[in-house]
A protein has these predicted regions:
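Alpha-helical scaffold segments that mediate packing/assembly in large oligomeric complexes
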Residues: 91-168
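N-terminal compositionally biased, intrinsically disordered segments and leader/signal-like regions
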Residues: 48-49, 58, 67, 133, ...
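Terminal, non-catalytic protein-protein interaction segments that mediate quaternary/complex assembly
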Residues: 63-74, 125-135, 236, 240-243, ...
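Helix N-cap / beta->alpha transition motif
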Residues: 85, 90-95, 184-190, 251, ...
Length: 305
């Protein structure tokens, strides 16, 4: 019979209920979530409708009409590679009282950061929010980096330069998309300093400039710096950032997020013969795909000395 020196034995359900999901995932904000079973297929394919907008010419309908105009539409096929990533944890029955739920919470947090890394950057198998290969998806726009911000310029001058970039982004959404609102995610130390270094009560702030430029509500969201560290990029086998600073504008209504498993503890049990409890934590692949024109618009930003 096994000996257990832990003062308080926790039932599995009780233990898992104590796990803290302390890292808020980015994916639910980015687009509509669609879960897949990893057992379904090696690759899940799906199609989107590419409407020829020039063919949308409605006919005037009257009793003598003999023909109604038809629209033209093609399809685009995209793929999602489903796979699981996992961690296991064992606790010996001979071990003194340990904070098992704390250990599992910390592990789930690490998996959550890596899930964000994949959501943002993508991998060799699946696309993320930031992709420089726009030719593979006609709904993903990569704007040319034709504006260089002087690193030594005043904050006002930098904001004025950013206004030109905002105008480009606004033009993309205005001419290609009917978004009701967009989120602009930004990254990079120099760009973050501009966003964070302003008093929101003045007219020269980023928010004030955005209100002047955008005709729809816009929110600015800093990409989690933790998820962009090389440690997590390497662990998640994610793609590299295309630039040190940049912005990616997203219309959540025009984006789908395919995934297999959100980071969480998924199973647990006890091996009485070997006298240990075991716990499994799992996460899985994720893909971010714009499904309408200008669903995602990327704009990198260059700072010169």
């Amino acid at each position: 019979m096994s000996t257990n020196f832990r003062g308080q034995e926790k039932e599995v359900k009780e233990l898992l209920a104590q796990v803290e999901f302390s890292y808020p995932l980015l994916a639910p904000r980015v687009g509509a979530m669609k879960q897949h079973d990893v057992k379904d297929a090696d690759k899940i394919s799906f199609t989107t409708i590419d409407l020829d907008k020039g063919s949308v010419t409605p006919s005037l309908m009257h009793p003598e009409m003999t023909e109604i105009n038809h629209i033209n539409a093609g399809t685009k096929t995209f793929g999602f590679r489903p796979y699981l990533l996992g961690l296991n944890y064992r606790v010996s029955h001979l071990q003194a009282e340990t904070d098992t739920s704390g250990v599992i919470s910390a592990a789930v947090r690490e998996l959550s950061v890596m899930f964000d890394t994949q959501t943002i950057l993508g991998t060799a198998l699946n696309k993320g929010m930031i992709s420089t290969k726009s030719a593979e998806n006609p709904f993903y726009d990569v704007l040319a980096e034709d504006t260089t911000l002087k690193a030594a310029a005043t904050t006002e001058a930098k904001i004025a330069a950013l206004k030109a970039l905002f105008l480009k982004i606004e033009d993309e959404f205005a001419t290609k998309n009917s978004a009701r609102s967009i989120d602009i995610y930004y990254w990079g130390d120099q760009l973050t300093a501009i966003f964070n270094g302003n008093n929101v009560a003045t007219d020269s702030t980023i928010l004030a400039v955005a209100r002047q430029v955008f005709t729809i509500p816009v929110s600015f969201v800093k990409l989690p710096k933790l998820a962009l560290q090389s440690k997590y990029i390497n662990a998640a086998k994610a793609n590299a950032l295309p630039a040190d600073n940049g912005m990616v504008a997203v219309d959540p209504a025009s984006v789908r997020v395919d995934y297999v498993q959100l980071p969480a503890p998924t199973a647990s049990g006890s091996n009485e013969e070997s006298e240990y409890d075991w716990y499994k934590m799992r996460t899985g692949s994720v893909s971010v795909l714009p499904i309408r024109d200008a669903g995602i618009v990327l704009q990198t930003v260059n700072f010169a000395g």
